[in-house]
Amino acid sequence: MSNERPYRLTLLGVAYRSAYEGQAPIELERLARTARRAGCVLPYTVAEGARLTVDVLPALYALADGAEELTAEERAGRALDFHVTMAAAVAEVLGILSVRTGLRTVALAGGVFQNALLLEELLPRIGDHHVLLPHRIPPNDGGIAYGQVAVALARMRCS
């Protein structure tokens, strides 16, 4: 057994241990909403090929740089920067895919889009697209379960 201390991973002091699913992103969004400055886009890259690859590691390094010494206000600003950066990256990928496919409609689904701040930052960046958002069915695993039930019912009716 090693005497080494376990590596602790946390982003800006948020949710070292999560008590429930989604706790860390909820806390990060809450922290970002207390920022007293505009957010800025941190460095990231999108590599084009058969697949698009988004590398946000440079942004994570920027967020972590000197994080131990940050004031609460500075942590809030960096949390906002994270959201702005993720929105910029999603918008860039959407733009590339739109050019490749000619599609102008996008469905924003999945638990990540329960983050209202991410949506607020993303929607203005993709304003020329027709955006579909879930309203009656949750965008997270509950929506997936609903879809699975719908498929099962359809298959039962066809058999």
Model regions: which residues?
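Conserved phosphate-binding/catalytic loops in two-lobed NTP-binding clefts
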Residues: 105-106, 122-145
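Short, glycine-/Ser/Thr-/acidic-enriched flexible segments
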Residues: 17, 113-114, 136-138, 151
